[in-house]
Regions:
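RecB-family 4Fe-4S metal-dependent nuclease core
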Residues: 1-270
Length: 270
């Protein structure tokens, strides 16, 4: 039986542009890190340090956790293609977002798991074994004792000017995380999956929260009425081997796609 490993964060890309997904995840063609992706990774590092301190009551301050983010930037700066932001810009933006996350988003949640270590999950669909992997950011618990997942998302368009957080493109990833968390920790995630959005655009970053209800159900579908889930469509693409391109994708740029200059779906002849 064919087995394909799929990282949760890459799953939505398979529907957006399968050709780009194949290049990155099957052919393993790497790309330089962008300044804005470095911001996102650094924010994750600093936020994780702060939230882990909250969970374990070790007393790390927001500013002390910011040091973790800055150290990460210094460590990874040599991997970045500095095209639109300088290292100074990246550090300043990272600290802005870090401060707002720790002061305005984190206190809204009672986290019980930070940077969850989960084993892979194998799901067989239509003769294809899909091995799901990933590291869920958070599990929170509400006042009634119910659990939910949360993921941090940064990016130029992560939050609109009116504070709306884009959630649609994160449904597949959220569904994978719910499956992995429930299997790893033997819990049921009844609450909506939360996207903590933080924009890297503008002088003052926008932040907000978006909710994804029933993410796992949207991923797996409903066998009782033969409703297909997103994972069934992903399996069909894998089974067919038809990794077609999408030249109208928002990520059809040199910055995001490793085959941009040779993609036949853009009229390039290899």
């Amino acid at each position: 039986m064919q087995t394909t490993t799929v990282r949760a964060s890459s799953l939505s890309g398979r529907f957006d542009c399968p050709a780009q997904w194949q290049a990155k995840n099957i052919d393993k063609i790497s790309m330089p890190r962008s300044p804005r992706s470095l911001i996102g990774n650094a924010v994750h590092e600093g936020a994780a340090a702060y939230d882990a301190s909250r969970v374990h009551a070790t007393g790390l301050t927001i500013n002390e956790a910011a040091g973790v983010a800055v150290d990460y930037i210094l460590e990874k700066s040599c991997e970045v293609d500095w095209i639109d932001l300088s290292p100074k810009d990246v550090e300043a933006k990272t600290l802005q977002i870090h401060q707002r996350y720790c002061a305005e988003i984190s206190p809204k949640f009672d986290f019980v798991i930070v940077e969850a270590a989960c084993n892979s999950v194998n799901i067989e669909i239509d003769g294809i074994n899909i091995c799901l992997t990933g590291t869920p950011d958070r599990v929170y618990q509400d006042f009634a004792g119910d659990f939910g997942g949360l993921d941090l998302k940064t990016g130029f368009a992560a939050v609109s000017k009116d504070g709306e957080v884009e959630t649609i493109k994160h449904i597949a990833q959220a569904g994978v995380y719910e499956i992995m968390l429930e299997q790893e920790y033997n819990i049921e995630l009844r609450e909506a999956f939360v996207i903590a959005g933080m924009s890297t655009a503008g002088q003052e970053p926008q932040i907000g929260l978006g909710m994804i209800p029933s993410a796992k159900a949207q991923l797996l579908g409903n066998p009782e009425n033969d409703t297909k889930g997103l994972l069934h469509y992903a399996a069909n693409i894998l089974k067919s081997g038809m990794f077609y391109g999408n030249p109208r994708s928002m990520t059809c740029t040199k910055q995001y796609c490793p085959i941009f200059n040779s993609c036949k779906f853009r009229g390039k002849l290899s």
